Amino acid sequence: MQNKSEDKSYVFVLKSLEGDGIVLTTSGISETVEPGQEKQVNLIFQNNSTYSLKSFGDLTFRFAIFDSNAKNQKGETDVFHIYPYGENKEVSYVFAPNDSVKPLDDNEIFEAVVTECKQDQFGDENVFFYLRNKTNKRLYINSDKGSVNGETRSTTRYFDVGPGQSLFGFITYQDLTIPEAEIKELQFNLRVQDVDNLAGGPLLDKTYTVTP
């Protein structure tokens, strides 16, 4: 990241990353860059078997940029694209469910399937899923509670998916002391709200059970 200003420091916040229009869940970016300075940042993805960054022909980054010394500002939005195979190449990812996916839910708000359950290099269990927003609303989805084999675990995650848009997301269970082979049941909740009407309460608040 490069701050071309001579006298202002800016905060760069990654609002979203999309691969061919599909929202991808990442570690996020929130970095302050001083005037005239550059900063290298790392964006972390969870490895999964459904896709890699090489699967997409168009990676779209949406940043909100704030003056670090100003208050109560909305921030300017900057959008840029990376075309791994060239801008005019006809490469576009399409999600094609295989026999290993497990249906999660199909209601008037969204359709979702579990694509994979596995532990990462830190020993945390992850439930990967694909979700399609069936509404004309921008949805804010969060998960803040869950369990592993009935033992309570935090699953704090936040997702934002636009009207008719799809999302690759994952739920993480941290600080596990249970070997992966002994995990029989994973539970988590999804609370779904209309971004433009958060005061109106949830459109859906439901607990799901997944067997790895």
Question: For each predicted feature, which ranges?
Answer:
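Asparagine-centered strand-capping/turn motif at beta-strand->loop junctions
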Residues: 1-7, 130-136
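Short, hydrophobic/aromatic beta-strand segments
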Residues: 7-15, 55, 137-145, 183
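Extended low-complexity, serine/threonine- and proline-enriched intrinsically disordered segments
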Residues: 13-23, 143-152
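Short, solvent-exposed, Trp/other aromatic-anchored flexible loops in extracytoplasmic proteins
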Residues: 23-76, 124, 150-200
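Short beta-strand elements
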Residues: 73-94, 201-212
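Low-complexity, acidic Ser/Thr/Pro/Gly-rich terminal tails and inter-domain linkers that flank the onset
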Residues: 89-121
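Short, solvent-exposed loop/turn segments enriched in Ser/Thr/Gly
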Residues: 122-128
